[in-house]
Amino acid sequence: MKEKNIEMQGTVIDTLPNTTFKVELENKHIVIAHISGKMRKNYIRILTGDKVTLELTPYDLSKGRIIFRSR
């Protein structure tokens, strides 16, 4: 049975190498997140200060995947 991913909103606070970012969630937790494959394929740029939507797995809440960038 596949576990459901947790979706959360956050703000990019730092850019790390290899399209990895430090994101501060709305509840003030800081997670490390990378870009999803579709965002990478469509060359969507993410800058510091952007509002993003993340997917977190229930197994490791310190890492996530950026699935959407808000305008």
Swiss-Prot record:
SUPFAM superfamilies: Nucleic acid-binding proteins. It is found in: Cytoplasm. SMART domains: S1. Its main location: cytoplasm. Keywords: Cytoplasm, Initiation factor, Protein biosynthesis, RNA-binding, rRNA-binding. It holds the Pfam family eIF-1a. HAMAP family: IF_1. Component of the 30S ribosomal translation pre-initiation complex which assembles on the 30S ribosome in the order IF-2 and IF-3, IF-1 and N-formylmethionyl-tRNA(fMet); mRNA recruitment can occur at any time during PIC assembly. Belongs to the IF-1 family. One of the essential components for the initiation of protein synthesis. Stabilizes the binding of IF-2 and IF-3 on the 30S subunit to which N-formylmethionyl-tRNA(fMet) subsequently binds. Helps modulate mRNA selection, yielding the 30S pre-initiation complex (PIC). Upon addition of the 50S ribosomal subunit IF-1, IF-2 and IF-3 are released leaving the mature 70S translation initiation complex. This is Translation initiation factor IF-1. It comes from Buchnera aphidicola subsp. Cinara cedri (strain Cc). The gene is infA.
